[in-house]
């Protein structure tokens, strides 16, 4: 085995990422003058303000792409992306500091 190598049993078929998780598809446009790249685990609600979309609907979501991947938006480009809900504790810290804690309040 090579360090970092992943052995996959192809007989089992395709692996479905984020199975059973809430997703949404949105249209995003880069109104800026520079390319913007968003990584796989970045809280989409907090991405660069030059990206225009229905931001309020993306609270608690990230891109539904494999870990370590990214999506690049060129200036003037508009594209459709799929988002997936964060799971686990659903606590978000950092990024742009727009959300610093739990996504849902405890009852």
UniProtKB/Swiss-Prot annotation:
Places the protein is found: Cytoplasm
EC code: 3.5.1.5
Listed GO biological process terms: urea catabolic process
Biochemical pathway: Nitrogen metabolism; urea degradation; CO(2) and NH(3) from urea (urease route): step 1/1
Keywords, in A-Z order: Cytoplasm, Hydrolase, Plasmid
Gene3D superfamilies in the cross-refs: Urease, beta subunit
Catalytic activity entry: urea + 2 H2O + H(+) = hydrogencarbonate + 2 NH4(+)
Gene Ontology MF term list: urease activity
Presence of keyword Hydrolase: yes
Gene Ontology terms: cellular component: urease complex
Similarity annotation: Belongs to the urease beta subunit family.
Protein name: Urease subunit beta
Gene from which this protein is expressed: ureB
């Amino acid at each position: 085995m090579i360090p970092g190598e992943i052995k996959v049993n192809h007989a089992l078929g395709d692996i479905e990422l984020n199975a059973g998780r809430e997703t949404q598809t949105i249209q995003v446009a880069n109104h800026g003058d520079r390319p913007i790249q968003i990584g796989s685990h970045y809280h989409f609600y907090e991405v660069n303000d030059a990206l225009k979309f229905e931001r309020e609907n993306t609270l608690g979501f990230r891109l539904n792409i494999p870990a370590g991947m990214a999506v690049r938006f060129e200036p003037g480009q508009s594209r459709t992306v799929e988002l997936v809900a964060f799971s686990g504790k659903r606590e978000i810290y950092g990024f742009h500091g727009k959300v610093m804690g739990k996504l849902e309040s405890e009852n």
